[in-house]
């Protein structure tokens, strides 16, 4: 795969788009249980984060956050999602925000940082308009009440 990283396309933008597609395919393979796919998705994400294109950076952070969480690398997952929500908040749609904040909360829970998880869930609860998303966040907060 290193050979592919360097020789995908002569044009930088086309190369980054192709790398993003490959990273997303590894993400899909990881969801299907393919061995090593999550690691590859995270690796492609790391390559793409150096892009000068903010849209590619945003997609790379989404990709890397999910891959890291799947690998139980919750510190890396939180870091990716924090970068995403801090540097690219304006470009995120509601579904992307929900995914990022929800996964960040789950990773904080996995790290035993319950107060941080509660803070994340409370923050997103105020920013969502979709009733199903709001209910999912309310359920997460309720689940954490006893902790």
How does the language model describe each region?
Residues 1-147:
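Acidic, polar-rich low-complexity tracts and alpha-helical solenoid repeat scaffolds
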């Amino acid at each position: 795969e290193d050979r592919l990283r360097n020789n995908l396309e002569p044009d930088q933008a086309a190369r980054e788009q192709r790398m993003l597609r490959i990273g997303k395919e590894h993400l899909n393979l990881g969801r299907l249980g393919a061995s090593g796919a999550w690691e590859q998705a995270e690796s492609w994400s790391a390559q793409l984060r150096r892009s000068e294109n903010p849209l590619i950076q945003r997609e790379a952070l989404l990709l890397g956050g999910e891959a890291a969480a799947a690998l139980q690398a919750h510190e890396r997952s939180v870091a990716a999602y924090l970068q995403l929500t801090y540097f690219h908040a304006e470009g995120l749609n509601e579904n992307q925000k929900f995914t990022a904040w929800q996964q960040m909360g789950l990773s904080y829970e996995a790290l035993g940082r319950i107060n941080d998880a509660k803070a994340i869930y409370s923050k997103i609860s105020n920013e969502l308009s979709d009733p199903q998303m709001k209910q999912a966040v309310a359920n997460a907060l309720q689940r954490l009440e006893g902790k």
